[in-house]
Amino acid sequence: MHDKKSPMANSHYLKNLKQQFRNKNLIETTIHLVKCNDHDSLAFLARTYGVPPQLRHVVWPILLKYHPMCISPNITSNTISWDPITNDFILNDPFLKSKAPTDKQDKSDDENILPYDIESIILHDLKKYFHSRSNPAGSSSNANTTNIATPTPVSSSDASTISSMEVLSPSLDYEFQIIETLKNAIVKFLLKWSKIFKYESGLAWIALGLAEWYPIYPYETMSPFNETHSFYEVEDYVVLSGRKHALLSTNNGNNGNSNSSSNNTNNNNTNITSGMHNLSINTNTSLHNSPYISHTLSYLYKEYPLPFELRSKLPTKPIFSFSALFERLALVILHCPDTILAHKQLKNDSNASSSSKANSNFNTNYFPIISGGDLSFQTQVFFKVFSSILPELYQPLTEESSLQPSSSRNSWIYWWLKCSGAKALQRQDRGRVWDLLLGWRPKPNMDTINFFLNYNDKKMDHLYHDTPQCDNEQYWMKDWIALYNNDPFWFPDLDSMALGSKKFPYDYSVFKELILRNRYGGTQSKAQKDNTVPSPGSDSNDKSELKLPFSSIDPHMQLIFIFIAILQFNEFKLLEFEEAEISEFLNNVPLLTKFDDSSYRKLYENTESSITSLPSSPTTSTMASLQSSSNSSAHISNYHMLIEVGNDAKASHCFDDLLNMAGDIWRKWLWRELEESSL
């Protein structure tokens, strides 16, 4: 007799089933796109659906290789600032001004020497991440836990092999090598960019956040990076496993040695934390000529399983060294448009205008909500949106000292905005947020690219395409585009406007047109009719009709609305918190994407250890099921103005819900601003 399940239980089961269908097909699609180097489609999937955690170490380097902010970088400076009174740049005291100078200070003109004792401070910040190697209060074997371990050659025949592996206790020397490699990556960045950016602790946490998903080679300082080093042939690659998960006991409660083959000569095993699991990796390599898997890549595949048949399709050689990839990630996170140039251009255009009103109000016209502003502007917008969207929460929290903006590097707003969630967000949530940052792409024409990168003097539009470039792209990408045929931060008619053109050179000119087009009772302008593009997900056999949707606004502005959505998601909880609890929440945001994370962890839980056959592309039935379940929320009309904020499904713990909420907040807030403006 079958058990009767409640409608809610059945609904939850079906939701999990559909999510697993989607995730499995997303993994297969991503692997196919990686194989054919279709970075445009990979970027689309990253910013909309997110990169599967099993594949970030492969996808992120591709996204950063072609990221516009890496090809033409410009980062915020903490060494100089613009003085509007003197109309000139002034030097800022560096962050370490309170530190006593050392002998190195006299040699600061040497390009190979950093001012002050930077390296020791970097090491101090990095060591905060790792657990203590000794615990006087306890003498159990669990006291010697850490976030990394010595890599070991292992068999990689299938996912179940990794599940039964054991871990060797890491040595202090090996841990020091990892920290040293992280430090060297930061030092290399500073040596290149120190004239405009001095060291901040955020760099250490950005490096650590990257190391949680991308393998580092801890002996890089002794053995130079070689692109022939394979993730699977070199046993010393390491992926950090996170610092904010409690140590759990194993199922059998045994912290000693597990049963292993007689060929395993090392019996000194211990358990260490990896994600939310204690995990053991066996050093037995019984299969002849089996490839070597990095110890903590095995951790990654234990935490987020990936069958061997799929892993075997991945490239094994890294595109970048860890230090090179860290530089590119830092360039994206610290990116800032040239605000001084923007003010000058706006002023010159205002002076050339015959309108005296435009000339007198050129400063008020600089409101780069779409194209992006500096950190000061981002902070201003964050609190402006916060007070407008969540007034009940904003008022009591602003009375608490924990929410006050601060210049301290320990301020939560520093970690949220300037460091894009480093340190403050959980590893899983931060990875998803960084997917969005790395997947950001404007429309592939120079006018639009220069609208966002106003300082750019490089031609790069030939690197990007508005159609999928992989083989059989209709079969692989059509359904994915149909499911998410608009950028999450769409706004009515914004996608049809030629950003950066002579008609729309600045944000305020775009705002004027948006008001004109969306005014109640207004009619569609001729320009709108001429520039309206067909839906990317429209059914057509013509390849040119299969268009990728591109990003509508600056990625750092997107993060502002995502963070506001996080506050709204936890609004009732925060209203009940004491000040200390609020401070803890802001500086250590609880895991937000439990549903997504659990789905990826259990994705291949019920599959056979060895998959006999895999589809070459997503199955029609699976994608049809996925499409039918997603069209209601994801397939949104680009001209829909009924903007609602908030819903009753706050317990889903799904990033898609958070992203949709952020998009709703963006549209509601911007429309309110446009209605109240004098444009």
Curated annotation (Swiss-Prot):
InterPro entries: Rab-GAP-TBC_dom, Rab-GAP_TBC_sf. GO terms for cellular component: cytoplasm. Residues 524-539 have a biased composition (Polar residues). Residues 135-159, 250-271, 524-544 are annotated as: Disordered. Present with 12500 molecules/cell in log phase SD medium. Residues 135-153 have a biased composition (Low complexity). Keywords: Cytoplasm. It is found in: Cytoplasm. Belongs to the OCA5 family. Its main location: cytoplasm. Coiled coil: none annotated. Residues 50-441 form the Rab-GAP TBC domain. This is Oxidant-induced cell-cycle arrest protein 5. Signal peptide: none annotated. Required for replication of brome mosaic virus (BMV), a positive-strand RNA virus.
